[in-house]
Amino acid sequence: MKAKAVRLHGANDLRLDKFELPEIKEDEILVKVVSDSVCMSTYKCAILGVNHKRVHEDVADHPAIMGHEMAGDIVKVGAKHQDKFKPGMKFTLQPALNYKGTMWSPGYSYEFFGGDTTYCIIPAEVMELGCLLEYKGKAYYEASLAEPMSCSIGAFNAAYHTHMGVYKHEMGIKKDGKLAILAGAGPMGLGALTYALHRDIRPKMVVVADVNQERLDRAAHLFPVEEAAADGIELHFVNTGKMEDPAAGLKEITGGTGFDDVFCYAPVEAVVELSSAVLGRDGCLNFFAGPTDKQFSARMNFYDVHYNSTHVMGTTGGNTDDMIESLRLTAENRIDPAVMITHIGGLNAAAETTLNLPKIPGGKKLIYTHLNMPLIALTDLREMGEKDDRYTALADIVDAHKGLWCPEAEEYLLAHFEQE
């Protein structure tokens, strides 16, 4: 079968290639990818090439398909998996395979397996690990976003707290505690926020701090503080760039106690140091954002580590249980991953979008892999409608949903735009 995909040939070398997929083996599955959301980790992979720990050294000879936040339809199933998977099933998958101790993952390491493609082959190890998941929901994008949501879910589940003299950790964020998300008004921060407000074990205070007022205003629009208060959560949106002393200002919001849980969503020295400075007693700092600099470092208050039991950790990705939780909470309408999406586009836009991701404002960029479409901000749909009525129809649907992408918008898009 012929496929078209964005593939990595080397550092800063992404190409939209057409190629022939081999026939699947008895332990493999052929799938049609419908949607793939672009991850900052994919940008890091693209600029580093073979210097990225998930990229094979022979990528120039065996280019790797980019993208790992994918969803689509199963097309053909190898004999070994026909009892569980059937053609026509919708799927998503957990890409953090960690297979036999390796770092290999779709979107980084595989020649015929990734998300920025029309079709791909899912290898045996994915099914062996239970990482291929049937998706029973309606919208493909919600299944794509289950992966980035699972990263934040995993971060919340990996947090831990202690009791003096007790050598056993209490896993998860502190119930009824005070939680901060620093550099938190970007797409991943908003994903963490929707989860913090609607998970089973919740904090009583959430502070979202950022230096981008436009992002903070959008976040406040999507998450009204009054609605959070009705659920018993005190929610604050704070621009630390306007504070003379951000650490003192954030601590003041907590009544001087500091935070029980702090999530750092930017690999920036000043943000990491601020995260350390606002920890309360037994505060857990999760350095969520992965740097590209292997020598990246920042100062941390080790007096507090010793005397106040503060601690630091980092998580990268979630696990299959986190993915399942994301899909469940989305199906129950408790979380809305669409808060992360600000742009849509076709496969033809994926390479340029990936290589320029830090320069493009807004949140998640959602790629529909069978469409030929430029990358378009949801806020620009109505302007695009001046030349094409279909964009006006999309703008009407999006505006009716608080400016968010939604199942109705995806359904209209896939029905009215030509697919390859």
Tell what function each PLM region has:
Residues D176-G177, L182, L193, L197-V271:
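Adenosine-nucleotide cofactor-binding segment
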Residues P22-S37, N51-K100, F113-G114:
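Glycine-rich beta-strand-centered segment in the early N-terminal region that forms part
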Residues A270-E273, A289-S309:
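Rossmann-fold NAD(P)-binding glycine/threonine-rich loop
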Residues D261-V268, A277-F296:
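ADP-ribose/adenylate-binding Rossmann-like module
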Residues P95-K178:
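NAD(P)H dinucleotide-binding glycine-rich loop of Rossmann-like/cofactor-binding domains
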Residues P148, A183-G186:
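Glycine-rich Rossmann-fold phosphate-binding loop(s) that bind the pyrophosphate
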